[in-house]
């Protein structure tokens, strides 16, 4: 029989902001905290580090680019808990500025993890969300810059209050195809694959929020995208202005919004404040 214990899950949780989010949830969330990572050894090492601090996370392997891996996690959650209370989608990749990998390959690889993988996790796990659940999709301030660098026509599409998930997926695919053809700039796209994937995650959050309000309005499940800020991680580099713990503050705030909270919902949140999209 599944336990009725509350459970929170963090993807990409073995280092950086994901690790800091997991540590904070272990301290503040009343229930089990699942630390997930693509690499089992790195994930177990992260769990041991938190155990040495007197915390008790559980580990489950998760590769968000592998549907079988996502479904194995989904089945585990169903069996062990029968549901999910908090989902923090943090797993991400980014190419360094100096990376010489051709841009169209960077676009394809970044999209596969940051947008497609996050979307697949949501498709499989959102149906498990319990009433009062919280979904946090970790995005980035680069998505705002990327949006402002899009053509007016693309900006209008990404800001639409009625855009569907299918339309969003179509736009993300078009970006990758346009990079392969070498026409992404003339088609109105910015020159940042990472920024475009994070635009996708932010708009996906808006769509998910709308869908949950329409179909499960009484359950008060809140979904938001957020920016942790510029954080000293492998990705952010050593000169960034925030520690991982400071970067975790907004995602954790959204993950632990009180049960009676009406919002934020379907918003892009930075430093615990809603940013205009």
Curated annotation (Swiss-Prot):
Substrate binds at residue 140. Its EC number is 1.1.1.184, 1.1.1.196, 1.1.1.197, 1.1.1.71. Present in liver and kidney. The active site is at residue 194. Changing residue 215 to Q: In clone RCBR6. Changing residue 80 to E: In clone RCBR6. InterPro entries: CBR1-like, NAD(P)-bd_dom_sf, Sc_DH/Rdtase_CS, SDR_fam. GO terms for cellular component: cytoplasm. GO terms for biological process: lipid metabolic process; vitamin K metabolic process; xenobiotic metabolic process. One of its GO terms (molecular function) is 15-hydroxyprostaglandin dehydrogenase (NADP+) activity. It catalyses: a secondary alcohol + NADP(+) = a ketone + NADPH + H(+); prostaglandin F2alpha + NADP(+) = prostaglandin E2 + NADPH + H(+); prostaglandin E1 + NADP(+) = 15-oxoprostaglandin E1 + NADPH + H(+); menadione + NADPH + H(+) = menadiol + NADP(+). Pfam families: adh_short (PF00106). Its main location: cytoplasm. It is an enzyme of class 1 (oxidoreductase). NADP(+) binds at residues 10-34, 63-64, 90, 194-198, 231-233. Changing residue 92 to A: In clone RCBR6. It comes from the Eukaryota. Keywords: Cytoplasm, Lipid metabolism, NADP, Oxidoreductase, Phosphoprotein. The keyword Oxidoreductase applies. Glutathione binds at residues 95-97, 106, 193-194. NADPH-dependent reductase with broad substrate specificity. Catalyzes the reduction of a wide variety of carbonyl compounds including quinones, prostaglandins, menadione, plus various xenobiotics. Catalyzes the reduction of the antitumor anthracyclines doxorubicin and daunorubicin to the cardiotoxic compounds doxorubicinol and daunorubicinol. Can convert prostaglandin E to prostaglandin F2-alpha. Can bind glutathione, which explains its higher affinity for glutathione-conjugated substrates. Catalyzes the reduction of S-nitrosoglutathione. Belongs to the short-chain dehydrogenases/reductases (SDR) family. Monomer. This is Carbonyl reductase [NADPH] 1. The gene is CBR1.
């Amino acid at each position: 029989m599944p336990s009725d214990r509350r459970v929170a899950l963090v993807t990409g949780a073995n280092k950086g902001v994901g690790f800091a989010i997991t540590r904070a949830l272990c301290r503040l969330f009343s229930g089990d905290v699942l630390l997930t990572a693509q690499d089992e050894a790195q994930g177990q090492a992260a769990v041991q580090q938190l155990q040495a601090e007197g915390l008790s996370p559980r580990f489950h392997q998760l590769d968000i680019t592998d549907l079988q891996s996502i479904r194995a996690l989904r089945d585990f959650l169903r069996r062990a808990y029968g549901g999910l209370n908090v989902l923090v989608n943090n797993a991400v990749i980014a190419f360094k500025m100096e990376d010489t990998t051709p841009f169209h390959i960077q676009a394809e690889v970044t999209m596969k993890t940051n947008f497609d993988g996050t979307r697949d996790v949501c498709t499989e796990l959102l149906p498990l969300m319990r009433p009062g659940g919280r979904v946090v999709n970790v995005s980035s301030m680069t998505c705002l810059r990327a949006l402002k660098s899009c053509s007016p026509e693309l900006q209008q599409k990404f800001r639409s209050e009625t855009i569907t998930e299918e339309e969003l997926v179509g736009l993300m695919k078009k970006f990758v195809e346009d990079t392969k053809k070498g026409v992404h700039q003339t088609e109105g796209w910015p020159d940042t694959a990472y920024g475009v994937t994070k635009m996708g995650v932010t708009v996906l959050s808006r769509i998910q929020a709308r869908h949950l309000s329409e179909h499960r309005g009484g359950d008060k499940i809140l979904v938001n995208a957020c920016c942790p800020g510029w954080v000293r991680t492998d990705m952010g580099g050593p000169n960034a202005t925030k520690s991982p713990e400071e970067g975790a503050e907004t995602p954790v705030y959204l993950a632990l919004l009180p049960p009676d909270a009406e919002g934020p919902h379907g918003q892009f949140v930075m430093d615990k404040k809603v940013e205009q999209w």
